[in-house]
Curated annotation (Swiss-Prot):
Quaternary structure annotation from Swiss-Prot or TrEMBL: Part of the 50S ribosomal subunit; part of the 5S rRNA/L5/L18/L25 subcomplex. Contacts the 5S rRNA. Binds to the 5S rRNA independently of L5 and L18.
UniProt GO cellular component terms: cytosolic large ribosomal subunit
Name of the gene encoding the protein in the UniProt record: rplY
Annotated keywords: Ribonucleoprotein, Ribosomal protein, RNA-binding, rRNA-binding
Function: This is one of the proteins that binds to the 5S RNA in the ribosome where it forms part of the central protuberance.
Region described as Disordered: 201-235
Extent of Low complexity compositional bias: 212-228
Lineage: Bacteria, Pseudomonadati, Pseudomonadota, Betaproteobacteria, Burkholderiales
A single MF term (Gene Ontology): 5S rRNA binding
InterPro entries per the UniProt record, alphabetical: Rbsml_bL25/Gln-tRNA_synth_N (IPR020056), Ribosomal_bL25/Gln-tRNA_synth (IPR011035), Ribosomal_bL25_b-dom (IPR020057), Ribosomal_bL25_C (IPR037121), Ribosomal_bL25_long (IPR001021), Ribosomal_bL25_short (IPR020055), Ribosomal_L25_dom (IPR029751), Ribosomal_uL5_bac-type (IPR020930)
Protein name: Large ribosomal subunit protein bL25
Classification via SUPFAM superfamilies: Ribosomal protein L25-like
Family: Belongs to the bacterial ribosomal protein bL25 family. CTC subfamily.
Gene Ontology biological process terms from the UniProt entry: translation
Entry-linked PANTHER family: RIBOSOMAL PROTEIN L25/GLN-TRNA SYNTHETASE, ANTI-CODON-BINDING DOMAIN-CONTAINING PROTEIN (PTHR33284), RIBOSOMAL PROTEIN L25_GLN-TRNA SYNTHETASE, ANTI-CODON-BINDING DOMAIN-CONTAINING PROTEIN (PTHR33284:SF1)
UniProt source species: Verminephrobacter eiseniae (strain EF01-2)
Length: 235
C-alpha cells in the first residue's frame, strides 16, 4: 500500500496549527540510517487511509519528493472529539532488521462448528491481534484462524493455529500457550414449578337474626350532694 507525503520546513505549535487549518496533517518519519524528517500529509486522504486495516499492520510505501521509502505506521494522535488527525509517526523499515508488530487475527468458520451448530454454544474471542516478530518481507497483513473444528467444552490456544512462514509470536506474562478463543456453553434457565393456589377462605355464615344493638352508653353519675349547712349558733 502506498501513499504520498510532502516535506515540511516549519515546525512548532503555531506552524502545526496553521497546517491543520489548511487541511494538512503534520508528521514525522524516523529510523534507519537517515535523519528524522518532518512531513505533512493531506488530511482527507490520510483519514480514509486510516480506516483500512492494512494501513496499520503492513509495510507501506511512502513517497516524499520523488523518493520512496518503506515505512510502518507507529503512532497516530487524534483530536479528543473532532474527526481530526493531529499528528502521525512513521518508522523506516530496514530489510535486514526484524520487526515487532501487532497483526490482526481474522476468525472464521465458527457458525459451522459443532459447538455452535449442534450444542448452541457461544464463541468468545479473547485475543483480536497478536504480537509477532518477523522480517519485513514476511510481515502478514493479517493471520487467518479457522474455528470450524470447535467443540463444546474446548478452547483454542496459540499453539493450535498455524502462523505464516517466518512469523514468531511474542509471548508476554509467562503464558507459553495463551488461549485465543473460548467456548461458552448455553445458559439453561430452569423455571420453578408453580405451586397450587391455596383455596380461598370460606366466608363466615351470616347470623339469622338482626345484629344486636350496641349497649347504651351509661349516663354520667349524678353530681355529688352539696355538704349540709352548718347549724346556726344559739344566741
Amino acid at each position: 500500500m502506498n501513499f504520498v507525503a510532502f516535506e515540511r520546513a516549519k515546525q512548532g505549535t503555531g506552524a502545526s496549527r496553521r497546517l491543520r487549518n489548511s487541511g494538512k496533517t503534520p508528521g514525522i518519519v524516523y529510523g534507519g540510517s537517515a535523519e528524522p524528517q518532518m512531513i505533512e500529509l493531506d488530511h482527507n486522504a490520510l483519514w480514509h487511509a486510516l480506516k483500512k486495516e492494512a494501513f496499520h499492520s503492513s509495510v507501506l510505501d511512502m513517497e516524499v519528493a520523488g523518493k520512496t521509502d518503506k515505512v510502518l505506521l507507529r503512532d497516530v494522535q487524534y483530536h479528543p472529539f473532532k474527526q481530526c488527525v493531529l499528528h502521525i509517526d512513521f518508522q523506516r523499515v530496514d530489510d535486514k532488521t526484524r520487526l515487532h508488530m501487532k497483526v490482526p487475527l481474522h476468525y472464521s468458520g465458527s457458525e459451522e462448528s459443532n459447538a455452535v451448530k449442534v450444542d448452541k454454544c457461544m464463541v468468545n474471542l479473547i485475543v483480536n491481534e497478536l504480537d509477532v516478530t518477523c522480517m519485513p518481507s514476511d510481515l502478514p497483513e493479517f493471520i487467518a484462524v479457522d474455528l470450524s473444528k470447535l467443540e463444546k467444552g474446548t478452547s483454542l490456544h496459540l499453539k493450535d493455529i498455524k502462523l505464516p512462514r517466518g512469523v514468531t509470536p511474542v509471548i508476554r506474562g509467562g503464558q507459553h500457550n495463551p488461549a485465543l478463543v473460548s467456548v461458552v456453553p448455553p445458559v439453561v434457565v430452569l423455571e420453578a414449578p408453580v405451586a397450587d393456589a391455596a383455596p380461598a377462605p370460606v366466608a363466615e355464615a351470616k347470623g339469622k337474626g338482626k345484629a344486636a344493638k350496641p349497649a347504651a352508653t351509661a349516663k354520667p353519675a349524678a353530681a355529688a350532694a352539696k355538704p349540709a349547712a352548718k347549724p346556726k349558733a344559739k344566741k
